Amino acid sequence: MPFDRQPLLSGEKGMPATSLWLVGGAVIAAVCVIVNTSYNGTQLSVTARPIQAAVSQVSMARFAESGVSRGSGNRVSQAVPLMAASVGAESESRRWVASAILFPLSGLFAAVALKMAMMKPKVAAVLPFTSEKDMKVWNPVNNKKFETFSYLPPLSDAQIAKQVDMIIAKGLSPCLEFAAPENSFIANDNTVRFSGTAAGYYDNRYWTMWKLPMFGCTDASQVLREISECRRAYPQCYVRLAAFDSVKQVQVISFVVQRPSGSSSSSWGMAAMTGEKDMKVWNPVNNKKFETFSYLPPLSDAQIAKQVDMIIAKGLSPCLEFAAPENSFIANDNTVRFSGTAAGYYDNRYWTMWKLPMFGCTDASQVLREISECRRAYPQCYVRLAAFDSVKQVQVISFVVQRPSGSSSSWGMAAMTGEKDMKVWNPVNNKKFETFSYLPPLSDAQIAKQVDMIIAKGLSPCLEFAAPENSFIANDNTVRFSGTAAGYYDNHYWTMWKLPMFGCTDASQVLREISECRRAYPQCYVRLAAFDSVKQVQVISFVVQRPSGSSSSSWGMAAMTGEKDMKVWNPVNNKKFETFSYLPPLSDAQIAKQVDMIIAKGLSPCLEFAAPENSFIANDNTVRFSGTAAGYYDNRYWTMWKLPMFGCTDASQVLREISECRRAYPQCYVRLAAFDSVKQVQVISFVVQRPSGSSSSWGMAAMTGEKDMKVWNPVNNKKFETFSYLPPLSDAQIAKQVDMIIAKGLSPCLEFAAPENSFIANDNTVRFSGTAAGYYDNRYWTMWKLPMFGCTDASQVLREISECRRAYPQCYVRLAAFDSVKQVQVISFVVQRPSGSSSSSSWGMAAMTGEKEMKVWNPVNNKKFETFSYLPPLSDAQIAKQVDMIIAKGLSPCLEFAAPENSFIANDNTVRFSGTAAGYYDNRYWTMWKLPMFGCTDASQVLREISECRRAYPQCYVRLAFDSVKQVQVISFVVQRPSGSSSSSWGMAAMTGEKDMKVWNPVNNKKFETFSYLPPLSDAQIAKQVDMIIAKGLSPCLEFAAPENSFIANDNTVRFSGTAAGYYDNRYWTMWKLPMFGCTDASQVLREISECRRAYPQCYVRLAAFDSVKQVQVISFVVQRPSGSSSSSWGMAAMTGEKEMKVWNPVNNKKFETFSYLPPLSDAQIAKQVDMIIAKGLSPCLEFAAPENSFIANDNTVRFSGTAAGYYDNRYWTMWKLPMFGCTDASQVLREISECRRAYPQCYVRLAAFDSVKQVQVISFVVQRPSSGGRSW
């Protein structure tokens, strides 16, 4: 049989003639073995003999690796009994026949092995089995662990070629990477810690790329040649082959094709290749590491041109960047640390751009000229060429085309003669601007050329400036991006020179503005940005003035004569506003011109003001953005002057408001914002008044027409957000606003709060992450009754306001516009301030006579519930009216309850939302009373449940509501407060009709989430729930846990970030077998419950409804509590029909996630699961790990953020070969499991179902536990 690898390439020499007799002898010996086997009538067993044969082959492979390859003679003799063990004889009398044949056969094999070891002493001879896959893996025991594919053994060319063919067939690009040993493992300085992304099979470390990804590669031999060249160049480095997805910009799969010589594995001895590529790379050993492409050697023009042609062909724009050595490496001050994005092949450092990206470049010679010019200008700098994607605003690929002179290799490229018309300032020992900052003083012609390109792309030119002390990156004027790609825009806040030049069609307009700004601010930096008014981001920017007296050449541009009609205040030594704040006092004509532009864009003018001490950026009035681009809106909360002017069609209306606001607040800043009512964000804003006594006086004529609203004085006044300074409003004023709210399809909603709870504080506020700053107040106040869904008349709202004012004269009351689709407050304003406060005139509204039928409890000095908690005891009629509304909205009524000590917001029963809007649902986990009432059509059903729950828990809070589609609480309100509390007693008549479930007592009882207090259920009760689960297309799924592991704790719980609070339990329990995909009968589930109960009488058992599409638990409830607990004993009759799987005992047993307690499985059991995996279009995938690496730990686990808890294990184990893409037969998987078990008897082995589309493990279960621990196999 073939013992060594196939010939490497066509250029490799063939086998010498002197060894032909050895091969011939081996063939003759093999024929003898076949004759001997036939003669003895050997019969191979289906279950035993192939495993014995495979074991002997593994032993022979080990012998070939460790013995023959090292020339060990002692190992040769040891191979004889190993081979003899693979052949069995039937009778003792015929043993001499086998011995007579095997003796010369052993000699022949020894001679062959000796000859091969002498010819190729460095080859790792991997034995390719005929019935098995062609890859082995290194031993992970006591071995520092690589991710994913790292333990694969030295692979032959045939083995690698087979994998490359699969990579190419999938439309991926092969990509070689390498790294010195000290940089090859996971560490913070060369690893992306993923947040908000699934655990796909790509390695999240930055290694160095060997040349560019092989885009367009169609032949495995091309890859083999590259591997050979890389091996010769870096015998002391790891080398891996990755499959690179050029669309998603991620590595999809990768595996190691070289381990450093001298390591525990065999050395690499591949024959040198004759055909070599035209690029080399620098030596990374003991060399400070660049990311991705940095070790590429000095490239010739032909080499660069070839890459540029590929870049242009892909529709990308070449883009040159450079950096002084001290700024060229990864550091916090010049790097974006990505969160929530895949690891694409772009470099996440900010270097300085050499001129603008070469948009529209069609010829590599243009790029070569730029490279030559940049090299001459900066011989002491690194220079890299990037491929810039102008649509996604990211660098896609980049590689270094110059390393500073004096480094390891000299540059000998001929100087270019044709040069572009721009130079750049010297970055050496120069405080670094981002992206475009080193560009030299530009002539008008140069600027005009760039402006033409900006206009042609549909962008708006936009001038900005800043005093030197504010122009660099610093925390107080910079957005640190999280969850966004590194586009070419500058993430500092400079001051805008007037508004973006929307609709600009002529570069001369921009040149005039630049001239004016230069004259006004000779000591400031000025930059020209291209502003995208759709995405609200700067796309590109470059400096058009540096302060006079700096190191650059003087500016000699001719002064412009035509000037615009706006000036700006001097920012020098002036506390800086964001974006628009230095604009000068504007005339009515100037403001009107801007307002016309705002209205034309479909935006709503919106006035805001603030006292000086509250007008600047500070934590208590500012949203720190996370996960959002830096649009041109000011991320501070000022106070709104009346509501946004929705439907405004005339600038004169705005001018009247500005005049009125100025007269009311001469000591305040006032700004005019353009408010986008769809996205709920400020888009642009500029200051129209600065406090009197400042650097410039205001001379605008007073306006005569005034609106009918005033606002309270914000000076020395604790500040509300957004709408809080509005004055006492008349009924007519409120009615006008309510009409606007109703016309927009929103629902009026009253809220109130005691003064001590009404301001921003951590315990009553949502701190937004990943969401824009909309005009809603992110505090939780108490709702006055439910949102007024379906309200069509402002008089209904006025009656409610009147009633709420009478009930709570010492509380703040606000009216919010509630969007029932997005579940957020859109706008809100205060309609009452507590009596006796510093404010304004008392409230004199006539008392309303018609009142609603609900009151609320007093929140004063009362521990606050969220949202709906102060509602008073409700009558049946009141509750029924609300239930009818809930049912009409397609929601499911759902009762919950909690003991008083567990009912308030606390870390152990509350989800702290990140990245989600503040909807009207309560983000606490209470205990569900039975399941949500799916399909409920009658309020009387709910009333009966409320009555039963009240009788069972007179000392508990009880609340009602649930949305079964979004798996969130949409609305909820308390229908019982514990007896003995300050509210009136409950006098509802007891209901007679009761449901068939009770719940355990939660008082002084360690709390389960969601469904845990349900009582022991009868078979009929469980079957009824299972029928509902199946009818919804969900899969029943049993889980269990020992008592000490069953509660919420950090080691078995997912803390959700960025996801809604659905009704599933966010703890990891152990799954009893796999989810019951395709289950159609409740009796199947009852049999499983019975079996699990008998196996684990001391464990909790719960039944979950598993959604196989979303990969989440949707609902779950406990069907067993440990014996000896406070609940009644379980008396269910034992079931006779059992499934074919058992599980290990979890009691006092370190816990695996999800599937880990499954028992040793037979081949038939595994094959049945593999058939299900294949039928779902998934790929079987084996993984293994040494015991010390197999459990959850920071170095081998992804901590999920922003993703649901699907049934896949979020640990990195080592893959046994590649995922079995295209596997169609369970027997293939069984052979791999058998081989892996023999190779690693002391390791855990698991079988995963790998989704090659989503790049995630979907399901996995253990098929081997180490022989030294736990139950034997």
Curated annotation (Swiss-Prot):
The keyword Transit peptide applies. CDD domains: RuBisCO_small. Pfam families: RuBisCO_small. Residues 1-134 form a transit peptide. Its main location: plastid. It is found in: Plastid, Chloroplast. One of its GO terms (cellular component) is chloroplast. GO terms for biological process: photorespiration; reductive pentose-phosphate cycle. One of its GO terms (molecular function) is ribulose-bisphosphate carboxylase activity. Eight small subunits are processed from a large polyprotein. All start with the same sequence but there is more heterogeneity at the C-terminus. Keywords: Calvin cycle, Carbon dioxide fixation, Chloroplast, Photorespiration, Photosynthesis, Plastid, Repeat, Transit peptide. It comes from the Eukaryota. Belongs to the RuBisCO small chain family. Heterohexadecamer of 8 large and 8 small subunits. This is Ribulose bisphosphate carboxylase small subunit, chloroplastic. The lineage of its organism: Eukaryota, Discoba, Euglenozoa, Euglenida, Spirocuta.
